[in-house]
Amino acid sequence: MTLDQISRIQALVAEIADLSQTFEGPSERFMVDGLPFLRKSEELVTLVQSPAEHATSLIIKTMETAVIRTLLSLNVLQTIPTTGSITLQSLAVATETQESLLERLLRVVTKTGFIIRENGGYSHSHTSLAYAGPLGALFAPCYDEGIRALVRLPEYLSVKDKEEAKNARYSLFTWNEGQEGKATFEILSTMPARTEGIHTLAMNVQHLRPYTGFFDYSKLVSEDRERPVFVDVGGGNGHVIKEILQAFPQIRPEQCVLEDRAETLELARTTGLLPAGVQLLEHDYLTRQPVSNAKAYHLRAVAYNLGDAELVQLLKQIVPVMGADSKVLIAENILFDDNSTVFSTVSDMIMLGIGGKERTEQNFREVLYEAGLTIEGIHRAPGLEYGIMEASLATS
């Protein structure tokens, strides 16, 4: 170890000692970057750890990740009592799992301290107890829709072109599921538990993807009361339109259009989210946009589901029907060039698996330029990577 490294270690130890004086506890919010005390502690571990120790730690952590997901699916974490302990035999009987298999799985998580083993019994740590509750319901879909396929990425790239998926129907996800040629939503529609997990995850990261508070939708209001003001392309069950109409009552429901697949629109009708007057229009966003001269075409959580080629294709379906003052509003994470957040980093790897992509400002500029659009403004939510790219027709 060099003198510079030793000096840095000593400086970090001093910083951590100072931070400990004001440390009030860790953050309990999911998918947020750690507080300075934790970040500095992790930096210290990285600095003092040898490459061999790093590799060993990584192997154990990878195995622990798979084991924790398995214990959740076997209902093991949910069966360990919240207080006290349970024997291996009782745990095996309660979960209908072979005792020797359980013993081997639990050996991994007792080694890491995730589960506590004392006097022949197994009990929760404060961390595993959280996984037995709501946290487990957030961890599971991240594993199922991200890690599960990503562990096969080296194999996938060895038999495919070494590039991003050009088409979401031929992605790491569809390949891993053995269903290439099908859309992601088609595959997931046969897996209700995993679909429910995705919805649960989406709801719990909503604070990182706010609907309003950073873009002035009132400027879209048109003097022409017959002109469509807000077309929500791939808008799901209507949450976005509902939130915008509540925050900007000067926009009339009759001037809003919700576009999506037929089954999604049927859900929008049954939930009762949308105020009367909003138009519902069945539409495949990779085909020609049916609403002409709208003031704004809005895409939230759509662009990141698509690779560059498919996003350009989508945008090119909108450009021919835009008016001179029409806008395209893309609501997504806009990644920082350096030091992206935990949330966007994880999200990008999940999107990589399904043929989508989180993008930097430059990535967006390139895609928009190819589609015949230019950026007019970038509107970030305060303190977040999330924001709206406001684009208009490019001038020749």
Swiss-Prot record:
S-adenosyl-L-methionine binds at residues 234-235, 260, 284-285, 300. It catalyses: griseophenone D + S-adenosyl-L-methionine = griseophenone C + S-adenosyl-L-homocysteine. Pathway: Secondary metabolite biosynthesis; terpenoid biosynthesis. The keyword Transferase applies. The keyword RNA-binding does not apply. InterPro entries: COMT-like, O_MeTrfase_dom, SAM-dependent_MTases_sf, WH-like_DNA-bd_sf, WH_DNA-bd_sf. PROSITE patterns: SAM_OMT_II (PS51683). It is an enzyme of class 2 (transferase). Disruption phenotype: Impairs the production of griseofulvin, but accumulates the intermediates griseophenone D, griseoxanthone C and griseophenone H. It holds the Pfam family Methyltransf_2. GO terms for biological process: griseofulvin biosynthetic process; methylation; terpenoid biosynthetic process. Griseofulvin is a spirocyclic fungal natural product used in treatment of fungal dermatophytes. Its EC number is 2.1.1.-. GO terms for molecular function: O-methyltransferase activity. Belongs to the class I-like SAM-binding methyltransferase superfamily. Cation-independent O-methyltransferase family. This is O-methyltransferase gsfC. It comes from Penicillium aethiopicum. The gene is gsfC.
